[in-house]
């Protein structure tokens, strides 16, 4: 999350707000590194994993975080020198991008992904609105990390590392601390689960738990070969992506061409990170980067995963990897929503029956930003009228307006219980229906809430291969307001 000091807020506060200790992480600047992971979140933190070959991960504390915090605040993820590696990234579309976004965008434009071997990131300072000096700090951070990645070399190696910042805006990076900390960071590089989990901790700000996922997969062209993918991510507030909200670093040992990697990442981001929202604010620092080194490729075969932009159909490997990557990145993105500031509910919104995926996704995103709906869910009220209200205005002023996409007489709204029983209808073809209040109450007591909006309820049973737009969000609580309003003592 990125915060800019709000001068004067403390002068109008009559009394300090109460914030539970495990949320006093970034607003109070003094406890994230010293606070335990809340019991309700511990199940989301893996105790082991399967990590891609040929990647080294390291983290260290260089003093960007306040005194007394020992958690890492500088991390580096890099492919070993012997592997031919490429990179890709999706970046925020916010008109006030942080220096890291500008520098990484320039690297991608210059390299077209070829030769990109690593990602360096820091927490606690967003390096936002810091002018040309801030840009030079980001460039220096990238160059110094590049020297480590290339084995203290020069030239291309110095322009091989993408850079990320997260934290407070309006402050200069402690670039001297960072550069002086690189030798220790290099010594801390390794391949174990502990290395990965510490790197995930190193990019946390208001997060209450580190976010890490990994899995193995195969490709149709070499079903006997097992590939791996791993990713770390962060975020708990200022979440409504348009990349491209959050930071994410993903690595795979599958062999992929640079243009294919960028296409795969962009498509997957559109159906994962770009489908989450907490409060509807798009960050200035959003970035998800991906590296592929082919280290697990059979017989040293390089780059079998490719695509032809002019082809009507892609290769089987491309299609299989795309499907896997969408699922994997969705898992990472959902961890961000699980950690939404003050959240008590994880909400899935499914929109069915839209003529196109973009139209359905837009509708789902509007519902996900509805304060009335989200506060209603916090109060354990399904609030179907709130869903319909958001649905009704969702297309106003958009390219989808006036095309008959929403027809009240064919629109139904239901909630899907987590126990696998039949969905519970609240609206049927534009009319409220009588519901089983006992069942409805039980449904809203659950942590996970799933809403289904069917724009073309024609009685046909929904099939799994039918396309739908899915969005993930959380409730808005008293705690959320308190956390973001706590600028007192």
Curated annotation (Swiss-Prot):
Function (record text): Catalyzes two activities which are involved in the cyclic version of arginine biosynthesis: the synthesis of acetylglutamate from glutamate and acetyl-CoA, and of ornithine by transacetylation between acetylornithine and glutamate.
Family membership: Belongs to the ArgJ family.
Subcellular location: Mitochondrion matrix
Quaternary structure (record): Heterodimer of an alpha and a beta chain.
UniProt cross-references to CDD domains, sorted A to Z: OAT (cd02152)
Site (Cleavage): 244-245
Keyword Flavoprotein: no
Active-site residues, record numbering mapped to chain: 245 (nucleophile)
Protein name, as recorded: Arginine biosynthesis bifunctional protein ArgJ 2, mitochondrial
Binding site for substrate: 205, 234, 245, 341, 484
Transit peptide residue numbers: 1-11
Maturation and modification: The alpha and beta chains are autoproteolytically processed from a single precursor protein within the mitochondrion.
EC numbers, comma separated: 2.3.1.35, 2.3.1.1
GO annotations of cellular component type: mitochondrial matrix
Pathway: Amino-acid biosynthesis; L-arginine biosynthesis; L-ornithine and N-acetyl-L-glutamate from L-glutamate and N(2)-acetyl-L-ornithine (cyclic): step 1/1; Amino-acid biosynthesis; L-arginine biosynthesis; N(2)-acetyl-L-ornithine from L-glutamate: step 1/4
Site residues (Involved in the stabilization of negative charge on the oxyanion by the formation of the oxyanion hole), renumbered to this chain: 166-167
Assigned keywords, A-Z: Acyltransferase, Amino-acid biosynthesis, Arginine biosynthesis, Autocatalytic cleavage, Mitochondrion, Multifunctional enzyme, Transferase, Transit peptide
GO biological process: L-arginine biosynthetic process; ornithine biosynthetic process
Catalytic reactions of this protein: N(2)-acetyl-L-ornithine + L-glutamate = N-acetyl-L-glutamate + L-ornithine; L-glutamate + acetyl-CoA = N-acetyl-L-glutamate + CoA + H(+)
């Amino acid at each position: 999350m990125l915060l800019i000091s709000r001068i004067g807020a403390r002068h109008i506060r009559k009394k300090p707000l109460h914030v539970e200790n495990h949320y006093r992480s970034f607003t109070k600047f003094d406890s994230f590194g010293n606070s335990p992971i809340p019991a309700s979140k511990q199940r989301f933190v893996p105790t082991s994993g399967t990590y891609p070959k040929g990647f080294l991960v390291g983290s260290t504390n260089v003093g960007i975080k306040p005194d007394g915090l020992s958690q890492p605040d500088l991390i580096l993820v890099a492919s070993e020198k012997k592997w031919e590696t490429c990179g890709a990234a999706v970046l925020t579309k916010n008109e006030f991008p942080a220096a890291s976004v500008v520098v990484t965008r320039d690297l991608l434009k210059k390299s077209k992904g070829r030769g990109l071997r690593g990602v360096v990131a820091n927490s606690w300072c967003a390096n936002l609105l810091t002018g040309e000096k801030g840009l030079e700090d980001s460039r220096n951070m990238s160059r110094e990390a590049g020297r480590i990645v290339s084995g203290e070399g020069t030239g291309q190696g110095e322009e091989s590392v993408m850079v990320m910042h997260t934290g407070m805006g309006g402050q200069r990076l402690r670039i001297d601390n960072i550069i002086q900390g690189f030798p220790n960071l290099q010594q801390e590089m390794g391949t174990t689960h502990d290395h990965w989990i510490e790197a995930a901790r190193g990019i946390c700000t208001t997060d209450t738990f580190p976010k890490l996922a990994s899995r193995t997969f195969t490709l149709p062209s070499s079903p006997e070969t097992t590939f791996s993918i791993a990713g770390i991510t962060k975020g708990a507030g200022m979440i409504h992506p348009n990349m491209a909200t959050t930071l994410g670093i993903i690595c795979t040992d599958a062999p992929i061409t640079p243009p294919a990697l960028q296409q795969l990442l962009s498509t997957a981001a559109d159906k994962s990170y770009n489908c989450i929202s907490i409060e509807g604010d798009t960050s200035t620092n959003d970035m998800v980067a991906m590296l592929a080194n082919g280290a697990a490729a059979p017989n040293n075969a390089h780059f079998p995963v490719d695509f032809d932009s002019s082809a009507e159909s892609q290769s089987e490997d491309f299609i299989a990897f795309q499907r896997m990557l969408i699922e994997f990145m969705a898992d990472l993105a959902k961890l961000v929503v699980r950690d939404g500031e003050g959240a008590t509910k994880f909400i899935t919104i499914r929109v069915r029956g839209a003529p196109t995926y973009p139209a359905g996704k837009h509708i789902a995103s509007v519902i996900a930003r509805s304060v009335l709906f989200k506060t209603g869910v916090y109060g354990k009220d399904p609030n179907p009228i709130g869903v319909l209200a958001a649905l009704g205005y969702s297309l106003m002023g958009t390219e989808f307006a006036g095309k008959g996409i929403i027809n009240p007489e064919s629109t139904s709204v239901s909630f899907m219980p987590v126990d696998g029983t039949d969905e519970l209808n609240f609206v049927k073809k534009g009319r409220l229906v009588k519901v089983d209040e006992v069942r409805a109450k039980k449904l809203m007591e659950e942590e996970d809430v799933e809403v289904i909006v069917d724009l073309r309820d024609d009685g046909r049973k929904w099939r799994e291969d039918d396309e739908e737009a899915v969005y993930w969000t959380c409730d808005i609580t008293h705690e959320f307001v308190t956390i973001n309003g706590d600028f007192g003592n």
